[in-house]
Regions:
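A glycine-rich dinucleotide-binding beta-alpha-beta segment and adjacent secondary-structure elements
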Residues: 171-186
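Predominantly flavin-linked oxidoreductase catalytic cores and closely associated redox partners
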Residues: 7-170
Length: 186
């Protein structure tokens, strides 16, 4: 994300990390023209404190809503413009990722691997990735759609099984997981 942010900023895109959009700005014709950020410096009682700053209007030729799963503003946009009128319901999944520092002899800078299916069984869908980054680091992850049929399926355990595949496991030999995370995605 940092790399992509740098590329966007080099093209003139303004990015405001730490400022949540609280509402949508529309012009007189109902066209989205930006967002209003949330107020800052609001006390626990909901009243403005001595450090209060009202939300800012951020206007742009283009406004991208990248809130993640079930974002509040995205829901408003979908409803207002009936974006779900002639479409299938959204699909949801869980994505699990890890960052590894691996043995230099197992590192192949630039290697990209994407898979689909295994080790998931019938009635489940998903896939994985593995990216060999700089500094002997590997990003590895696994995504499982949340509409799986087996109530006992554990996405985390399936991810661990994936890393034991004969074509994958040797990359992690003598390696160390240095960070991990999970996120709902749609």
């Amino acid at each position: 994300c940092r790399w992509l942010a740098t590329q966007a900023e080099n093209l003139g895109v303004e990015i405001y990390p730490g400022f949540a959009a609280a509402d949508i700005l529309y012009d007189d014709n109902g066209v989205v023209k930006g967002v209003i950020t949330g107020d800052m410096g609001v006390g626990k009682d909901g009243e403005p404190s001595d450090r209060f700053m009202p939300g800012m209007e951020l206007r742009g030729k283009y406004t991208f809503f990248a809130e993640g799963v079930r974002g509040s503003l995205s829901k408003k946009i979908i409803k207002k413009f009936e974006l779900d009128k002639e479409s299938c319901p959204q699909k949801y999944a869980i994505g699990i990722k890890e960052l590894w520092e691996i043995d230099p002899k197992n590192h192949k800078p630039g290697l990209v691997l994407h898979t689909q299916g295994w080790p998931l069984s019938k009635g489940s869908a998903g896939g994985s990735w593995m990216y060999h980054l700089d500094n002997n680091q590997v990003s590895v992850g696994f995504v499982v759609n949340l509409d799986y049929e087996n109530p006992y399926l554990s996405p985390y355990e399936e991810f661990q099984r994936f890393k034991l595949h004969p074509s994958i496991k040797d990359y992690f030999k003598n390696g160390k997981r240095i960070s991990y995370g999970a996120r709902a995605i749609n």
